[in-house]
A protein has these predicted regions:
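Conserved short "hinge" loops at termini or chain/domain junctions
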Residues: 1-79, 127-143
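Hydrophobic residues within well-ordered, non-membrane alpha-helices that form the packing/core
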Residues: 52-55, 102, 122
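Short, mixed-charge amphipathic alpha-helical segments
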Residues: 77-89
């Protein structure tokens, strides 16, 4: 049994999260790459849309057409799952993946850390969906 849920995500909210994360990071270590700022928002919005679509494919969700600032999707969840928590996880995964991509050439360690965090969050989301294909596993065989 699954429960279809519609999740709506604000592009501007994700941009604000990215700006906040880079501001904190820059404050802690100003010698690192510069912060991502408001003039970069059109580029960030494009990346957010493509990352959102990829995330939908990875979780078995069905993305709807973009409506100005809102990205929405329908995802089938196991019963009793809090939709707000899944929405927050989607936003977190998108933010982390964008940070990983943005810092890939400037700070590889930070980029790898963001990818690890995103993968952990994705695994959690996938555990609550009923439409996502199982994560591939290698099974040892002894002959």
């Amino acid at each position: 049994m699954n429960t279809p849920a519609t999740i709506a995500i604000s592009i501007k909210s994700i941009c604000a999260s990215i700006y906040a994360r880079t501001a904190i990071r820059h404050t802690l270590d100003p010698n690192r790459p510069p912060m991502l700022t408001q003039p970069m928002q059109p580029a960030l919005e494009q990346l957010i849309c493509s990352t959102f679509t990829t995330l939908c494919l990875e979780t078995g969700a069905s993305p709807a057409a973009r409506d100005e600032d809102i990205l929405s999707t329908t995802i089938h969840l196991v019963p009793q799952v809090n939709t707000a928590a899944i929405r927050a996880a989607f936003e977190r995964i998108i933010s982390l993946r964008l940070l990983a991509e943005a810092y890939a050439s400037a700070d590889r360690a930070y980029s790898a850390q963001m990818n690890t965090f995103a993968d952990t969050s994705l695994a959690a989301v996938r555990s609550f969906t009923t439409t996502a294909a199982p994560h591939p596993r290698k099974t040892p065989h002894i002959f």
